[in-house]
């Protein structure tokens, strides 16, 4: 078991690193990837003249990238949409799109402390890294064959790395519950990793069938399979390094140049 554990971590670090996107330049990379995937490849959103996809939720979000360490190319991204601190009753996007379908006997987001919840969205991977058969029309693909064995060479390092980074970034900002709209099979994929994703309502149509779901950051960390813990801890260190760097810039740059969410919890 130990060689497999070490191989999983070493393989990830040999090819990829997680980079919190707290600077203007890094957020620009996020918006560029999103335009490539959501506007050009999938046509989920209209193309923009500046080739940057962004919306009204980006200013209140925590953004993250994954980079190919061999080429320096950023190959994927995601974000965590937080409730605005100046408007705690603001509804997250899934609360609007699933207002009539959330099973509030399972969980009612309206009753939770708003600063402790957030929504994962805009997870995207550029096309050269999702070109296996049947995956080109998905922003961040995974398949059953990826999970035959966790140490299998097809292990989906990019989407798993982004999800692990999201959980750790959320934890560091006091977010306990993460909501998201997911493809129907994602819960079964992540169950193989020891990650419990709970469905909180029936599927809705949102660029294909999407199921409103949730996961607890503390439960994900506590229940993670042993073989994956070193990988998670490596990603956690990369997140922490990004936060430290952002905090350092905040003391030396003019106010407003660094994303406020990066240095406040």
Regions found by a protein language model. Give the residues of each.
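Short Gly/Pro-enriched turn/cap motifs at secondary-structure boundaries
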Residues: 53-56, 203
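Acyl-donor binding region in acyl/amide transferases
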Residues: 85-214
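Structured alpha-helical
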Residues: 49, 92-97, 156-160, 173, ...
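Accessory, usually C-terminal, subdomains that scaffold auxiliary metal cofactors
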Residues: 194-252
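Short amphipathic alpha-helix that is part of the acyltransferase structural core
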Residues: 4-52, 59, 63-70, 79-82
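Glycine-rich phosphate/pyrophosphate-binding loop shared by adenosine-nucleotide-utilizing enzymes
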Residues: 71-77, 118
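Hydrophobic alpha-helical segments and helix pairs
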Residues: 77-80, 87-88
């Amino acid at each position: 078991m130990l060689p497999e554990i070490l191989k999983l971590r070493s393989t990830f670090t040999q090819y990829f690193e997680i980079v919190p996107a707290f600077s203007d330049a890094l957020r620009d990379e996020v918006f560029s990837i999103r335009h490539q995937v959501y506007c050009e490849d999938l046509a989920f959103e209209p193309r923009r003249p500046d080739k940057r996809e962004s919306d009204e939720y980006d200013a209140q979000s925590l953004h993250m990238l994954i980079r190919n360490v061999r080429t320096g190319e950023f190959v994927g991204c995601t974000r965590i949409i937080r409730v605005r601190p100046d408007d705690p009753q603001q509804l997250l996007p899934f609360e609007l799109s699933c207002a009539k379908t959330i099973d509030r006997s399972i969980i009612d987001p309206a009753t939770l402390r708003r600063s402790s919840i957030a929504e994962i969205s805009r997870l995207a991977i550029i096309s050269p890294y999702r070109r296996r058969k049947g995956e080109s029309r998905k922003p961040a693909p995974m398949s059953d064959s990826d999970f035959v064995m966790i140490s299998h060479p097809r292990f989906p390092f990019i989407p798993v790395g982004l999800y692990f980074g999201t959980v750790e970034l959320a934890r560091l900002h006091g977010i306990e519950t993460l909501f998201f709209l997911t493809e129907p099979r994602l819960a079964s994929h992540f169950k193989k990793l020891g990650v419990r994703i709970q469905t909180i309502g029936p599927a809705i149509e949102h660029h294909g069938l999407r199921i409103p779901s949730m996961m607890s950051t503390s439960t994900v960390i506590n229940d993670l399979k042993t073989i994956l813990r070193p990988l998670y801890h490596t990603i956690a260190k990369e997140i922490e390094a990004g936060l430290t760097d952002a905090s350092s810039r905040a003391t030396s740059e003019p106010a407003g140049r660094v994303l406020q969410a990066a240095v406040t919890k």
